[in-house]
């Protein structure tokens, strides 16, 4: 087993417990941001290929399955963030043997979850589509797409867990390289399967599955070859119960929060579906651009999680909090920079996905009404990520469920039944939810101590922080 000889950056991991805070946050966030942009771009290529070369029904089908896919991926990402928090705290505390145990426990769990997700996804596809009021003309293609996607979802899960492990020790660069390879391959296969072989929506699904499998393979090869504490040694693959308990403590609330928040979007989608196919098309385009606008703050939030995790591992709460303040300031500045061109060029951005005038009108309207409120999102994203890094994901789960699920559903119900069944009053449920969530998260963050939820100290082992 390889021990970390010194606390300074190795050839790939980065120790965030010393050195320039802003520099660490930005250096860590940039590959994340670039990687996420690539991921969104290749999702957009999928949508663009379908919208321009297959059919309008197929375009709506890919949009319709979005919330279902996001719900399951969100669930797994929440769980893998739990793994990342455990590893980053032990890495910060220089507890190499615990890092090793966490890596191998996480990978065994991932294999088990791959089997569960594949079975559930393939088995429940028709039921999920029916629950979402999927129109009959879109149903066969939506069903075909989801069945292939879930059949090959293991690649996505393994890649996400492997890259989460690397990020926990400060290496956000290599996961980015693998994403680029995956995105380029996905685009090439899209064009080959759809344009050359005429495979339609199924071709798009196969392209995604193959590209994700390649990124999973690359991340496993790196874990097998790395000289760091996160090295994968196949004979050591087993579940270590003390570490498993900690992963569950952080990961399960995060997974529930992400899955249920995404599930609440399924309800929003069914309200949108009631406005007809043009509005569905506009909403599909809006959600694609929305995901790009959220990326700067999400990348900085992930930086904050790793930064807080490593610094609390060392027992340095003031430095951890200083990092959170910097991350929030950078996230807000970046969000404003992204917002300006979106407000200016909303119709052109919508038309990139679908040139039908009615669809463009809906998409541009949605973008211009909702995007000025994204700055509110920075607060809940960064503070919740910081609390998660401290091992406290239960509180953020409760706050987000109350804001994004309870509050938003009550808002949608009252608005649609008693006030106005028009599009804009309904979709203002998004900014209203962000406002409630940000206020509650900020109040909680100010009143809570990071060290009380730290994982390293509770671990019961004598060999604690130096």
What are these regions (language model features)?
Residues 71-74, 118, 186-191, 216-220, ...:
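Hydrophobic transmembrane alpha-helices of multi-pass small-molecule transporters
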Residues 16-53, 67-82, 86, 111-118, ...:
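N-terminal transmembrane alpha-helices
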Residues 1-29, 87-154, 196-252, 308-373, ...:
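Short alpha-helical transmembrane segments in multi-pass integral membrane proteins
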Residues 37, 41-60, 129-136, 192-199, ...:
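Helix-terminus/linker motif at the lipid-water interface of multi-pass membrane proteins
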Residues 54-67, 143-146, 205, 277-292, ...:
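Small-residue hotspots at the loop-to-helix junctions and early N-terminal turns
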Residues 27-46, 148, 159, 182, ...:
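Transmembrane helical elements of multi-pass membrane transporters/channels
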Residues 59-119, 156-175, 269, 282-346, ...:
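Small-residue-rich hydrophobic transmembrane alpha-helices
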Residues 80, 148-167, 175-183, 204-219, ...:
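Short runs within selected transmembrane alpha-helices of multi-pass transporters and secretion channels
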């Amino acid at each position: 087993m390889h021990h970390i000889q010194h606390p300074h950056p190795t050839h790939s991991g980065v120790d965030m417990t010393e050195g320039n805070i802003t520099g660490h946050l930005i250096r860590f966030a940039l590959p994340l941001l670039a990687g996420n942009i690539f991921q969104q771009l290749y999702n957009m290529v999928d949508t663009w290929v379908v919208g321009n070369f297959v059919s309008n029904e197929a375009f709506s089908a890919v949009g319709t399955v979005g919330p279902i896919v996001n719900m399951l991926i969100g669930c797994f990402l929440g769980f893998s963030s739990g793994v990342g928090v455990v590893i980053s705290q032990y890495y910060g505390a220089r507890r190499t043997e615990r890092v090793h145990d966490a890596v191998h426990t996480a990978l065994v769990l991932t294999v088990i979850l791959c089997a569960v997700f594949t079975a559930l996804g393939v088995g429940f596809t028709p039921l999920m589509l029916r629950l979402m009021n999927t129109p009959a003309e879109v149903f066969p293609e939506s069903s075909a797409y989801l069945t292939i996607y879930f059949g090959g979802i293991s690649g996505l899960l393994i890649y996400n867990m492997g890259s989460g492990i690397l990020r926990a020790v400060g290496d956000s660069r290599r996961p980015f390289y693998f994403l680029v390879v995956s995105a380029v391959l996905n685009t090439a296969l899209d064009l080959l399967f759809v344009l050359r072989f005429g495979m339609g929506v199924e071709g798009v699904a196969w392209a995604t599955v193959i590209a994700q499998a390649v990124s999973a393979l690359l991340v496993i090869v790196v874990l097998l070859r790395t000289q760091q504490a996160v090295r994968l040694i196949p004979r050591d693959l087993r579940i270590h119960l003390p570490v498993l308990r900690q992963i569950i403590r952080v990961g399960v609330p995060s997974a529930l929060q992400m899955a249920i928040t995404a599930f609440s979007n399924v309800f929003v989608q069914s309200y949108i579906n009631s406005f007809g196919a043009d509005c569905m098309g506009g909403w599909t385009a809006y959600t694609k651009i929305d995901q790009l606008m959220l990326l700067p703050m999400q990348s900085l939030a992930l930086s904050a999680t790793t930064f807080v995790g490593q610094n609390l591992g060392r027992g340095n709460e003031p430095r951890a909090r200083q990092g959170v303040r910097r991350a929030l300031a950078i996230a807000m500045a970046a969000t404003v920079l992204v917002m300006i061109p979106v407000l200016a060029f909303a119709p052109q951005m919508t038309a990139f996905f679908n040139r039908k005038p009615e669809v463009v009108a809906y998409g541009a309207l949605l973008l211009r009404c909702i995007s000025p409120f994204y700055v509110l999102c920075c607060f809940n994203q960064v503070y919740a990520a910081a609390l998660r890094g401290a091992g406290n994901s239960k509180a953020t789960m409760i706050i987000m469920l109350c804001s994004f699920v309870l509050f938003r559903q009550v808002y949608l119900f009252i608005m649609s039944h008693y006030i106005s069944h028009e599009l804009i009053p309904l979709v203002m449920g998004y900014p209203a939810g962000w406002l409630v969530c940000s206020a509650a998260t900020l109040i909680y963050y100010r009143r809570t101590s990071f060290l009380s939820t730290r994982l390293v100290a509770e671990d019961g082992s004598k060999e604690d922080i130096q």
